[in-house]
Amino acid sequence: MVTLTNAESVLKTVYLDVVSNQLNTEINPFLAKIKQSTEDVWGKEVRKLAPFGINGGIGAGTEDGNLPSAYGNQYVQFVSTLKNLYGAIEISDKAIRASSNSVGAFVNLLNAEMEGLLKASAFNLGRMLYGDGSGLVATVTTAGTGSCVVDSVRNLIEGLAVDVYVGEEKTAAAKRITAIDRDTKTVYFADVNLAVTAGAKMYVQGSYNNELTGLGAIFSDSNTLYGVDRTAHRWMKPYVKAVDGDITEIVIQQAIDRLEEVNGSKVD
């Protein structure tokens, strides 16, 4: 017979590893290219010593002349806090009792919920990779009650639950999106009485300033990244090539050459 104890065991021993593996390896081509390691994790932080520039103890000279002065490598320490991505499912006791005499029925119930959770986790983790860590998914451009128009629906999807902020104040929590008109950028909420003002910002529930440091943060104009002052260490500012006309192979190659010559990067 399937019991709550059995269900807990299945979730821990069967599903946890599967979900973790799929999120780490199958969620996004960009994530798959990033080397993953835990060796720089210390407690609740990630600390990585990063060299920059070159060793300065180099110089030409005569056979019996003085050796060049010794200048060692230069380092900065990157510091970031660990981030948590939670996923929760809920199965009522009635659903468990209804399938208590059929292991197959209960497994199907778990499979459906876990697949849905994995899809939601994949969507949000993929979004975070390109975000700025704030959890911001949209800004309201036209106010409304039960619905509103936003600046972009790229990071929104039916079923997503969002918190609404006006400035630093949370005015609504965990409001679920039921429908999206992607042509008009109109978002509809399950709470038909929800009043949303223009300029309000939507964040994934509970994620305000708690998400991964994605490309949005790396390419932002902020002066600090991973605890390092980017005004003092200008090499930490990512290279952006402005293009007035069409993006051609020559333009792409010029950008690649710059990265290889200046940064020693190997562009994939």
Predicted regions and their residues:
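Core alpha/beta structural scaffold of self-assembling particle/tube/pore-forming proteins
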Residues: 1-54, 71, 77-268
